[in-house]
Amino acid sequence: MARFNHLKGVFGLLPTPYQADYEIHIPDLKAVAEFCCSSGQHGIVWPVMVGEFYFLGEEERLRGLDAVLEQVNGRLPVVFGCSGVSLSQVLLFARAAQTAGADSIIAMAPARTNAALAIEMYKRMADVYDGPIMVQNADAYAPLTGEQIAQLVEDVPSIEYIKEERQPGPKHIAEVYDLVGDKVKTIFGGAAGKFLPDELLRGADGCMPACEVADVLTKIMEIWWTGDQEAARELHRRLLPLILLETHPMMRYVLQQRGVFSNTIGRTPDGAQALNAGDKAEIARAFKYIEGDLNGYPFKAE
């Protein structure tokens, strides 16, 4: 089944776009998948927290997977987010990923469960999906200890990747790397890429940020791989003011201003995170520091 032997690098997380009637905007979902491909990112993940998986119905989520796979057409690995409200729903999504041909699957345990259920979930995912599995280890979703992850990797050979996002991220990445760094292919960090250089020093070789400026994070990663850590850090310092502004409204706005999304509609009110003129002006100022490092799709300030 595997089209890609080793997943690493920057895997852009797709925000879910919506129409005026709050249905998934399939053309925009395809457009953001194309953006990841065309801007040089190393992989695609949908839907996880950035894609607001908790707002998506089962059927529309599977239609979205089909749309992303169709648009990508094998150019990048596509990781399907299988997190759900129950173990049975997680397994439904894992089976669907098997049928659709997703390159990998990722999941967190359902909310308000515990580590025992999380461990059982990953074992049962391996029963219904024969590709590589990613453990997503996050604070609010029955997180596993490093020792539990090590035992799980031993028990489930198809667990080849870990996304470690217990906070503080770099410290926990180091813990997991010390225990399973020679047993899994890649440890991914998260946190929007805010701590990327430190995560890389501690054992990560991948990052899963929201995709709206992940082309710049990709450039940072690739510079790091050449061995020029100071140049990578210099670009990261210039990007940091922008990613510190990241919210769901900001992601959608940036994708709209980069010509990817046709609107900024979400399924929940933006509330206090709604962007006003001052917010948009600050985003535009932050883009000035990295505008020469974008891989196409220039940002158009209002």
Feature locations, PLM:
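Short helix-capping segments at alpha-helix termini
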Residues: 70-76, 100-101, 129-131, 154-158, ...
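Active-site beta->alpha loop and helix N-cap motifs at the rims of alpha/beta catalytic domains
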Residues: 3-142
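C-terminal alpha-helical cap/extension of soluble enzyme domains
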Residues: 11-16, 39-40, 200-204, 211-302
